[in-house]
Amino acid sequence: MATRQRESSITSCCSTSSCDADDEGVRGTCEDASLCKRFAVSIGYWHDPYIQHFVRLSKERKAPEINRGYFARVHGVSQLIKAFLRKTECHCQIVNLGAGMDTTFWRLKDEDLLPSKYFEVDFPMIVTRKLHSIKCKPPLSSPILELHSEDTLQMDGHILDSKRYAVIGADLRDLSELEEKLKKCNMNTQLPTLLIAECVLVYMTPEQSANLLKWAANSFERAMFINYEQVNMGDRFGQIMIENLRRRQCDLAGVETCKSLESQKERLLSNGWETASAVDMMELYNRLPRAEVSRIESLEFLDEMELLEQLMRHYCLCWATKGGNELGLKEITY
């Protein structure tokens, strides 16, 4: 059990890094997503006692359609993660690519559903910020220390490695660096592995995201990949989304792969994955348990259902599998 003494035994060595200025807009999406999740949690969309330790509650109220969209996203990704954990009986590892301020590790621990090891990867600048929060806030550090076999836990500005949890600062476009750092933190390529990318691939060029998907498929014999991002971006609504992001210096470099659900599945299948499925978020929303829908729709009034539908039709949840027939990975669905 973690104690105050053990909490204080997390030590850090500060270091600096130079980040490409062109990535500033992409890094800014981490803050946007964290603020949106924090607000949705604050009004009761889902339970997450950890997000408050990474981001302050914004004074700006988020629109109801945004809150419902984030609820569907969190619910959908969570259901697929738990399905993978059940199939593997938690004898597996999870690699969250572009994790930002994600709190899945802590929430899975609370549900006694932790994999053998949970890895997070993001830009070094984002990782530095996350590690600072972990170091300074016992509700975040204590669960890590409880699972760690040693009395002290070393971390520097860009990496934390413990028995069950690791955070790595790396550029997903540099696969040799990514693999080297993951292996340094004891990533086991023989274990069934779930990789997660939420609004990550779309900020990479099609070639870069294809290389990442191929690397993932080639690195693990039994694996699953979850991808959440834009879809149906060729219509007028999609073009407006692209223009709005460009005005914020955030270019969707990989938007051409987001034409349709079919193009999303084809990308996965053409880069080493054996099965691929995809649903847009409106379809996913319509599949939610009716009791949950009634609960969240009672939280706040939504003027225009059409706006929610437009938004949800332009995001999708995709998942792909490779190997793992004996585990039933191909049977995983939403």
From Swiss-Prot:
GO annotation, cellular component aspect: cytosol; nucleoplasm
GO MF annotation, one: protein C-terminal carboxyl O-methyltransferase activity
Source taxon at top rank: Eukaryota
Reaction(s) the record says it catalyses: [phosphatase 2A protein]-C-terminal L-leucine + S-adenosyl-L-methionine = [phosphatase 2A protein]-C-terminal L-leucine methyl ester + S-adenosyl-L-homocysteine
Cited PANTHER family: LEUCINE CARBOXYL METHYLTRANSFERASE (PTHR13600), LEUCINE CARBOXYL METHYLTRANSFERASE 1 (PTHR13600:SF33)
Family: Belongs to the methyltransferase superfamily. LCMT family.
Name the record gives this protein: Leucine carboxyl methyltransferase 1
Gene this protein is translated from: LCMT1
